Amino acid sequence: MAFDHIIITLVHGTWARHTRWVQDDSRLCQQLRTRFGDRLHLTRFPWSGWNQASARLSAAKRLRVHLQKLILDHPEAEHFIIAHSHGGNVAMYALQDDTLEAKISGLVCFSTPFLHVYSREASRGGGETLRLGMLNAWPLFLIALLIASGQVKNSAAPLVIGLLAILGCLLFILWETWSKQLAEQLQFPSMKHTRLLLLRATGDEASAALGGAGCFSWLSAFPIRLVNAISARPLRLIAQHATTIRARAGVVGIRIALLACAFVVLDAISHVQSALRIHQWLGPPIAPVWFTYLTAPLAIYVGLLFASLLPTLLVPILLFLLGFMLLPFGWEVAIAAPFIETFAEATPPGTWNIIQLSRRECLWPRDEESETGGLRHSAVYDSQRAILEVAVFLAERLNAALREKLGSQLSQLSGKTRVKP
């Protein structure tokens, strides 16, 4: 029993729409045709090749449709993917569809820098502090400033500051939400290690550059980690005390606290009315309450200002670090860097078989290239050793698929599940 078709989809990497290795006259294609004959069919999947997360995700959606159509048109064929560089990430994102992933017999990745993307744990406390502080401190400070000055004209400054704080808070929330959604989209599917072949070259320039960029990814979150370090203990103490107060005071204590807050609000309103020269309605002009309400928002505002000032002073450094991430990771990952961790690794998460080619093995016999000529990142798909490894991998996967199909047929004939000895 033999397969009628072996269909291999070739996926190029970044900035390589017209690369030669996916063409019929390339060494890889010629060698595979020689070994597998007429039953081998090669298809090329072109995509933009832009070094952007959105470009790779968009290409993954199109590749998913491309593979689904091939499987629908050739259900009895064995389907493989061979990808180079970020084309491997495109293929992995396409296989996030579990149904499609189960129908792909194997994936070969040449020099793929697998991007591991995770949401930053450090952004939670710092982000929460900035959001709550900006939303809650500005109206209190506005009222306190009105009370202290007694002049209407001075109310414009805190009002503008408050509106800017709300706008900044909303932008911060949108920024963080978008970044975490991007991280979720850039996750890898679950695959059996026997269905993935990884080939890499010693001295891969792209991997070295991406590895260095991972350090800038870590440093870019320093402002938020700093805010988180400052605010973590106060937030924890507030949460602990709030639990204690609720447990000890109960419903009666909470009602008393709410009543006290109501008195504070009425006192503040009376002073605002006085500052605006509006006829006052009854309010409790209690000096201690007024003083408490005046100092509390000022303390909150000063604390917020201190917490916001440190990361603000570090903005130039942050922009400098993000600039170093633009070229290796693309602008989306660079912008999301304060909220996500991005590292380029030799493999996806898990246990895999990886073949590391030496510098000499990256050259075809009788090649006239010098030892320093050409990019090692682009030499793998022309390596005789790499092409032989791909051929062996394809043969092993075909044999495994054949055994599986024969076992399924035997089970149907015997009416029971075939048990391996």
What are these regions (language model features)?
Residues K180-K192, L196, A201-G203, L210-P421:
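Terminal low-complexity/disordered tails
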Residues A2-I8:
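Extreme N-terminal starter segment of soluble prokaryotic enzymes
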Residues D24-L40:
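A short, Lys/Arg-enriched amphipathic alpha-helix followed by its capping loop at the start of a domain
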Residues M1-A2, T99:
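Short amphipathic alpha-helices and their capping/turn segments at secondary-structure boundaries
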Residues I8-T19, Q23-L28, W47-R225, A239-I256, ...:
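Serine-dependent carboxylesterase/thioesterase catalytic core
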Residues R35, L70, D98, F343-A346, ...:
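Hydrophobic helix-cap positions at the C-terminus of alpha-helices
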Residues D38-S48:
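A short beta-strand-loop structural module common to alpha/beta enzyme folds
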